[in-house]
Amino acid sequence: MSILFHAYPLARPALFAMDAETAHEVTLAQLQRAYDCGLTRKLLHAQPEAPATLMGLSLRNPVGLAAGLDKNGAHIDALGNLGFGFVEVGTVTPRAQPGNPKPRMFRLPRANALINRLGFNNQGLDAFIANVQRSQWRSQGGILGLNIGKNADTPIERAAEDYLISLAGVYPHADYVTVNISSPNTKNLRALQGGDELSALLGQLQERRLALADQHQRHVPLAVKIAPDLSDDQIDAIAEILPRHGIDGVIATNTTLARDAVQGLPHAEEAGGVSGAPVHELSLRVIERLRSRLGDAVAIIGVGGILSGRQASEKMAAGAQAVQLYTGLIYRGPALVGECVRALAQGSR
């Protein structure tokens, strides 16, 4: 355990000298090698006991991996064994697509932030499912979330078709499914967060889920991932719609388009969504508002800007039942997982 944890701070300067997306790929490849050699196998069992329940699912601990880090589900076991209680991979679209032109990911180290405009780059649903089927994570008791989106060339008016295709494909292989309607990097996608559009989409997804549950004889929870840039009225409308359509969870939040916290920094004006530290307070506002409107009707997963155990605890105090990490891992490395688990275990005593 100590070898891996000490290795990342030593490797970080070299990784940060690379293009951000290249460094991301190198890190995943090295992590996979470490897992294949057995160097990460003990990390999963080194965390303190912090059992939690989320959307009816039993978690080892309430600290998860956010979608986006492993878009194709190729590294589920290696990532899960860093000590996560649950892992979410994707976003996957029905057909493979390259995403936006490179460069499309930028670090802002002074703000502990990233800007990305990746655009749902992925190998498509068939390759994604094949990767998921090869994973041992679920058979070892890990919880797996599969995150679905729409192809860039699918008109927004036909977005539901893409989500329905992907839901049917991933349903047998998921512990829960996340409907991503909040990436700022797919044209018009965030329009699906609007009241009428959201209600229409979720109505179709719930109908399909009921049929899939009957076909596979199991209920798979559905979550919706939303943006941090919503007004109070928009949050209230979403909070009214989710339980009406039987949605089990809401992930708050995705990246922000706001630039206030990074103004004047190199790359600050690059197009795309900001993740990392600047999102923490924005997501707290959304979580608090959702919890006040939802009560206990829908589970909330808090994500955005968690770079310490204290910030994970703040997400829970705001009303989340679980948290997810992504950008914090890039700045802090795998030690962040255990720090967050310990903080939440201590807070639950």
UniProtKB/Swiss-Prot annotation:
GO terms for cellular component: cytoplasm; plasma membrane. Pathway: Pyrimidine metabolism; UMP biosynthesis via de novo pathway; orotate from (S)-dihydroorotate (quinone route): step 1/1. Its EC number is 1.3.5.2. Substrate binds at K71, N116, R117, L118, G119, F120, N180, N185, N254, T255. Its cofactor is FMN. GO terms for biological process: 'de novo' pyrimidine nucleobase biosynthetic process; 'de novo' UMP biosynthetic process. SUPFAM superfamilies: FMN-linked oxidoreductases. It catalyses: (S)-dihydroorotate + a quinone = orotate + a quinol. Keywords: Cell membrane, Flavoprotein, FMN, Membrane, Oxidoreductase, Pyrimidine biosynthesis. The active site is at S183. FMN binds at A67, G68, L69, D70, K71, T91, N147, N180, K225, T253, G276, G305, Y326, T327. One of its GO terms (molecular function) is dihydroorotate dehydrogenase (quinone) activity. CDD domains: DHOD_2_like (cd04738). It is found in: Cell membrane. It holds the Pfam family DHO_dh. InterPro entries: Aldolase_TIM, DHO_dehydrogenase, Dihydroorotate_DH_1_2, Dihydroorotate_DH_2, Dihydroorotate_DH_cat, Dihydroorotate_DH_CS. It is a peripheral membrane protein. Binds 1 FMN per subunit. Belongs to the dihydroorotate dehydrogenase family. Type 2 subfamily. Monomer. Catalyzes the conversion of dihydroorotate to orotate with quinone as electron acceptor. This is Dihydroorotate dehydrogenase (quinone). The lineage of its organism: Bacteria, Pseudomonadati, Pseudomonadota, Betaproteobacteria, Burkholderiales.
